[in-house]
């Protein structure tokens, strides 16, 4: 079923015209945290907007975010109302627990809303907005901070091809961007949203292993990070199954297959699969709580 739904999302993507109006977009951010900052920089790099064409709402004591937007030429305000009235596109970029507090500020908003708030369903957002408001739910991950994000999005019932193309063009500026059905957002969050944390643990463990075997910690971290980067690039760019790439490294009776046997014996695969499953369940719990509220 999931494969069918993913294929359905990919089919929708194929139908999107590639001639979006390329005029610069005025963009408002409700919430000016690190992800909003990363997106703003990506939009500027891609020529989709300019610093002076973006406005973000921040808490008065969030000096770091205020300064970050100032550095790219953007203004910040301490309330949401000016941001809601400001641009062509509004990005809801606050923590999920804050969403119920800011939605009343959007009660008259009728333009395109892109929500990156984890676990907040499209139905909850659409219910709080005027009928007909186009809403798209987006799930980026933190590597978007360095332009290597993995993002998916799902359309609300009033978001058409034009709105989907705007979302895809914006989020493609900070990495990969794909369309999926909304019921796949939770497993995507567990895999790609939480996945960097799992990989950081792997990098740390690889480095610790190197240190245990005599490497100095600085070079151990560099080698571990570069190894993960290189392996990921191989999977992405060669279109080769990761199992085949693994086999290519593992010589008969060699050190690699010996290490693989140790990992298999200690349940590495099962632990990672279980982590994605557990994180998906937690995402669904958050979504369920949001719907009740």
Q: Where do the protein language model's features map onto the residues?
A:
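A short glycine-threonine-serine/GTX helix/turn-capping micro-motif
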Residues: 188-197, 218, 246
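Rossmann-like NAD(P)(H) cofactor-binding subdomain of soluble oxidoreductases
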Residues: 39, 55, 62, 72, ...
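Internal alpha-helical scaffold of NAD(P)-dependent oxidoreductase catalytic cores
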Residues: 124-134, 150-187, 200-237, 282
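NAD(P)-dependent Rossmann-like dehydrogenase/reductase catalytic/cofactor-binding core
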Residues: 19-23, 225-293
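N-terminal amphipathic/basic-hydrophobic helices that include classical n-h-c signal peptides
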Residues: 1-23
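NAD(P)+-binding Rossmann beta1-loop-alpha1 motif at the extreme N-terminus of oxidoreductases
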Residues: 18-78, 148-149, 211-212
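Small-residue helix-packing motif on alpha-helices
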Residues: 54, 83, 216-223, 245, ...
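Alpha-helix N-cap/start motif
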Residues: 50-51, 122, 217, 242
